[in-house]
């Protein structure tokens, strides 16, 4: 008597989180503990960074953005930063994805004031970025998205939010507070009213303090400029505390705490 074949067990994929980071460090600096905790809990974690293109022969302000970090003009600054990101993601348990869009200094923003000013009328990078995000959503089918609130007002952060707004639909999104800008007194919050109206979601990542620190410290080229060195990074993370704070659109993931919207982001 023939034995009927045994049907294979259905493949059940772990839940998936996709973090959309403007730059190569934003996700780790702002929510590295959350990324690590989700990875430790069995989630598949991907961090897709928007503005990572290497631009040969940088000029003007774009060149200054690498020379002020001690790099020579012929250095491939973004290749260095992508390598740092790969190291950081390995620490946090995430897969890095690098989208091929140029940073703001290569799109006509000529000084630091412009980076934190109004988005240029001719800067429409959010349209092709939205197309790329839509492709990622189709490919990865994330359970949850993470993205910045735009605290600090950097144009690249604001344009990423515009791009995500085009394609997010009813997705569940945790919007992070952009660190280190959020830790600075009177940091601009151009979208503050929007996010303060959403419920707050918090996650205690105290158990992953060291992993969060080591992930952030992997961005060695940025530590002097952003924090004054690794020791000061550690101090700033300690000052920020072990709780990472978000605003929530949609259904919250397990493990955190949800509260009402409030002033302060």
Model-derived features: where do they sit?
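Active-site beta-strand->loop->alpha-helix modules in alpha/beta enzyme cores, enriched
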Residues: 2-167, 213, 262
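The feature marks non-catalytic terminal segments
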Residues: 2-5, 75, 83-115, 119, ...
């Amino acid at each position: 008597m023939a034995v009927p074949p045994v049907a294979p067990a259905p493949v059940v994929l772990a839940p998936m989180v996709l973090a959309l980071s403007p730059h190569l460090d934003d996700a780790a600096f702002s929510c590295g503990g959350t990324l690590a905790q989700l990875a430790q809990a069995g989630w598949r974690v991907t961090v897709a960074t928007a503005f990572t293109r290497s631009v040969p022969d940088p000029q003007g302000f774009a060149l200054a953005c690498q020379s002020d970090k001690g790099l020579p003009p012929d250095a491939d600054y973004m290749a260095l930063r992508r390598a740092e990101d790969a190291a950081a993601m390995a620490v946090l348990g995430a897969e890095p994805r690098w989208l091929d869009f140029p940073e703001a200094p290569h799109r006509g923003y000529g000084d630091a004031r412009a980076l934190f000013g109004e988005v240029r009328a001719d800067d429409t990078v959010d349209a092709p970025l939205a197309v790329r995000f839509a492709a990622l959503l189709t490919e990865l089918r994330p359970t949850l998205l993470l993205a910045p609130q735009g605290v600090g007002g950097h144009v690249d952060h604001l344009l990423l939010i515009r791009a995500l707004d085009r394609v997010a639909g009813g997705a569940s999104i945790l919007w992070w507070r952009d660190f280190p800008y959020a830790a600075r007194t009177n940091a601009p919050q151009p979208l503050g009213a929007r996010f303060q109206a959403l419920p707050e979601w918090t996650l205690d990542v105290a158990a992953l303090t060291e992993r969060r620190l080591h992930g952030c410290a992997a961005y060695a080229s940025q530590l002097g400029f952003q924090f004054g060195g690794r020791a000061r990074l550690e101090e700033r993370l300690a000052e920020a505390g072990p709780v990472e704070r978000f605003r929530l659109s949609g259904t919250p993931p397990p493990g955190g705490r949800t509260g009402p919207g409030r002033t302060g982001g």
